[in-house]
């Protein structure tokens, strides 16, 4: 039961379980959006900072880059080996792979114990779509993998994070 005041009249609203579930879903999806946007921002800052140092000819030591990246991984990614990931291969892309200003979430879908976020992306002047798959780990939603659609071959390909 919810009470609210409208034009000095108290209304009682009885909400069904379905509506409550929808509200819970909206809260969960907002949480996923927040996690994704924070991850995108931190990855963007990490890669942008590394690129600025490369351009200036003052490279940051790999140990410092790895430590900062590991902190981002620990905060946002599921705990699993990423053999081709940025942490293992120490790759820095230009422009940065992830940029929250160039992504727009278009769909959030729950599938069993995971949630998939689909977004439209503008990367290096090209439009693409990405799928971000989240899993719950230790009670927190963490990013498990990222795929990008290749319009050339019509397939989804993994982005190494």
Spans of features found by a protein language model:
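Surface-exposed, charged secondary-structure patches
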Residues: 68-125
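A structured, charge-rich N-terminal accessory region that forms the first stable segment of a protein
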Residues: 43-78
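Short hydrophobic targeting helices and cationic amphipathic motifs
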Residues: 3-4, 14, 19
């Amino acid at each position: 039961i919810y009470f609210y005041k409208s034009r000095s009249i108290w209304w009682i609203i009885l909400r069904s379980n379905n509506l409550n579930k929808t509200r819970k879903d909206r809260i969960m999806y907002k949480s996923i959006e927040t996690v994704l946007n924070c991850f995108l921002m931190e990855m963007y800052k990490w890669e942008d900072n590394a690129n600025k140092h490369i351009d200036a000819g003052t490279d940051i030591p790999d140990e410092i880059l790895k430590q900062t990246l590991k902190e981002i991984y620990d905060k946002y990614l599921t705990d699993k080996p990423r053999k081709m990931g940025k942490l293992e291969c120490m790759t820095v892309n230009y422009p940065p792979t992830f940029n929250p200003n160039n992504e727009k979430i278009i769909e959030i879908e729950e599938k069993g114990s995971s949630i998939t976020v689909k977004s439209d992306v503008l990367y290096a002047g090209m439009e693409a779509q990405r799928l971000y798959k989240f899993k719950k780990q230790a009670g927190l939603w963490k990013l498990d993998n990222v795929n990008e659609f290749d319009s050339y071959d019509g397939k989804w390909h993994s982005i190494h994070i």
